[in-house]
């Protein structure tokens, strides 16, 4: 069973229902097509705590990060909404800080859900 977390940006909430990420997950398309032959479980669908909220400075964010660590996911998929810049290839500083913690814990990070970047 592939245990998966999806991380997205709260700034996208005005235009995003999460439906495209969930559709890609449920239909095993786009970034989730790599799991075509595996059982999958979505163990968390989370947003960071917003711009300016970094690990170690925001208790709620720290709790969310720890929840993911405790859930022991096999992989974290980061939505394109968490990218920045004209080319949409880099994480914002907050997402970069969060994913670095998980990577150091041995959790692979995949750039993409319904869109890959």
Language model features: what each stretch is:
Residues 106-117:
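Divalent-metal-activated hydrolytic enzyme cores
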Residues 81:
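Flexible loop residues that form catalytic
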Residues 72-73:
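Proline-aspartate-enriched helix->loop->beta-strand connector
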Residues 1-66, 88-91:
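Conserved mixed alpha/beta catalytic, RNA-binding, or beta-rich assembly cores of soluble enzyme
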Residues 41, 101-102, 108:
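Flanking helices and flexible, charged tails adjoining ferredoxin-like Fe-S electron-transfer domains
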Residues 87-102:
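Short Gly/Thr/Asp-enriched flexible loops that form oxyanion-binding sites at enzyme active sites
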